[in-house]
């Protein structure tokens, strides 16, 4: 990237989250992540610009020194901090403004710090030689927390039975965040059972909310509409996917080709999510099983009588297993973490300079990582134990809010890293992104939010089996084919 020749016309709006705007290069497989600031701070003092630079350096350090060792080198791309001309940033801000969702416009692009994070464009396959005319398809999934908490500190029985995502759906519906309940359950996706994973992905396609996006050649082709009242257009998605599954254009086992295409598409995603497992002597992938946590959420629409405990698990080197292992660093739940947070706060009131030694605001380096890895299992009453558990919780929260990118394209026979489906065959890559640190100061908010979510769920469900909520949408036929 030639920083002295930056031209806003070489870049296009790619998307944004709460903290940053992403723009992608028109010709190269690169994106720039540019931080956002509240509109009222857009005047930007010199101090604010320095804080922004420190923030973006923290993002890169946290990804490089904490999340990459935990999740695996092959899955995490930390990027590099780049200095950018201020005029380029100002012009870029004007260019993307008209494409930004209205609900995101409470913040503006930072145009004063002169820095950004350069990363590979994970919606593309840089090693794909484009011998095939079909551009890469990229599926972005935000899987959320894949286990039921098992902490003795929990005060409500429902938290042992119903996952956080499914409970949160009721709260978001009541607050107008979404117009319909999602039937997606993270525990189904993380189960390792191809049947349960199929159901989870099918439910994401039916109600993507902000947990599923699909790109084609780097262009967004499927996501939740800005108007949440609109249903996602599956027919349009099928038309985009049809060239990738040409053998499904006729009736297949009596089913319409559109349904068969979606079935094949889901199976490709499942195969990528389960790939990468190590093999033991028998040649079977080593599996990861949850020993302490209940493996099934009672709010999941998947029939409980079809679950065979002990027969499934995630290959230990698969992307979902890696994410789940990091999520499970939270073994106390927020109800166990909050008292430890208060212990740290009380200590800091007496010794405010200790905030630096405890690395509450970073730096996110090997020392921080050592604290996360070496925390004691038993509480000895010390502030060291408390901050160790708080840091573990923050890292686990990052993993609970990360995204998985699966990018695939039709491959040539001699290409490696391919999904071995009977037909067609795809070359693919799997990556993890959205790996920012979760703020220490956010713990009181998480504690209050947890209580609101649980209490609202208990009031709204009033004890009938949660699966009865979905009776009106259970007429679909599920297809399970060998992969």
From Swiss-Prot:
Gene Ontology cellular component annotations, sorted alphabetically: centrosome; ciliary basal body; cytoplasm; extracellular region; nucleus
Broad class of where this protein is predominantly found: cytoplasm
EC supergroup of this enzyme: transferase
Top-rank lineage group of the source organism: Eukaryota
One GO BP annotation of this record: determination of left/right symmetry
Compartments where located: Cytoplasm; Nucleus
Comp. bias regions, Basic and acidic residues: 281-297
Tissue: Expressed both maternally and zygotically. Expressed in cleavage-stage embryos. Ubiquitously distributed throughout blastula stages of embryogenesis. At the onset of gastrulation, it is enriched in cells around the blastoderm margin. At shield stage, expression is detected in the deep involuted cells that contribute to mesendoderm. During mid and late gastrula stages, it is strongly expressed in axial mesendoderm. However, it is not present in the nascent tailbud at yolk plug closure (YPC) stage. Expression in axial mesendoderm is reduced at the 2 somite stage (SS).
GO molecular function, one term: ATP binding
UniProt note: domains: The EXKPK motif is conserved in inositol-pentakisphosphate 2-kinases of both family 1 and 2.
Name of this chain's protein: Inositol-pentakisphosphate 2-kinase
């Amino acid at each position: 990237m030639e920083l002295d020749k930056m031209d806003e016309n070489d870049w296009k709006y790619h998307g944004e989250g709460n903290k940053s705007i992403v723009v992608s290069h028109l010709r190269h497989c690169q994106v720039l992540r540019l931080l956002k600031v509240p509109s009222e701070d857009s005047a930007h003092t010199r101090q604010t610009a320095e804080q922004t630079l420190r923030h973006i350096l923290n993002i890169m350090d946290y990804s490089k020194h904490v999340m990459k060792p935990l999740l695996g080198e092959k899955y995490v791309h930390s990027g590099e901090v780049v200095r950018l001309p201020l005029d380029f940033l100002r012009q870029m801000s004007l260019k993307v403004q008209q494409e930004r969702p209205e609900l995101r416009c409470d913040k503006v692009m930072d145009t004063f710090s002169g820095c950004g994070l350069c990363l590979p464009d994970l919606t593309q396959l840089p090693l794909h030689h484009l011998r095939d005319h079909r551009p890469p398809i990229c599926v972005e999934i935000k899987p959320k927390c894949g286990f039921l908490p098992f902490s003795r500190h929990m005060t409500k029985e429902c938290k042992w039975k119903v996952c956080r995502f499914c409970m949160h759906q009721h709260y978001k519906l009541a607050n107008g965040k979404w117009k319909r309940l999602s039937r997606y359950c993270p525990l189904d996706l993380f189960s390792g059972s191809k049947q349960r994973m199929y159901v989870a992905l099918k439910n994401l396609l039916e109600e993507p909310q902000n947990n599923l996006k699909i790109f084609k050649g780097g262009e967004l082709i499927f996501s939740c509409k800005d108007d949440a009242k609109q249903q996602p257009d599956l027919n349009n998605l099928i038309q985009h996917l049809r060239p990738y599954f040409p053998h499904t254009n006729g009736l297949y086992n009596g089913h319409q080709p559109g349904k068969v295409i979606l079935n094949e598409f889901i199976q490709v995603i499942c195969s990528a999510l389960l790939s990468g497992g190590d093999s033991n002597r028998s040649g079977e992938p080593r599996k990861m099983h949850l020993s302490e946590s209940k493996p099934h959420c009672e709010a999941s629409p998947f029939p409980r009588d079809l679950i065979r405990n002990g027969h499934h698990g995630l290959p230990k080197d698969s992307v979902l297993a890696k994410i789940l292992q990091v999520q499970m660093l939270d073994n106390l739940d927020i109800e166990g973490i909050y008292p430890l947070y208060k212990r740290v706060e009380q200590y800091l009131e007496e010794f405010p300079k200790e905030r630096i030694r405890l690395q509450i605001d970073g730096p996110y380096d090997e020392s921080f990582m050592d604290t996360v890895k070496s925390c004691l299992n038993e509480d000895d009453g010390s502030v060291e134990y408390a901050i160790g558990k708080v840091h573990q919780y923050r890292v686990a929260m990052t993993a609970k809010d990360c995204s998985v990118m699966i990018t695939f394209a039709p491959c040539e026979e001699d290409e490696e890293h391919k999904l071995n489906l009977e037909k067609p065959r795809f070359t693919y890559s799997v990556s993890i992104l959205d790996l920012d640190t979760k703020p220490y100061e956010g713990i009181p908010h998480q504690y209050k939010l947890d209580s609101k979510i649980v209490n609202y769920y208990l009031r709204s469900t009033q004890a009938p089996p949660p699966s009865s909520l979905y009776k009106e949408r259970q007429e679909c036929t599920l297809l399970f084919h060998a992969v």
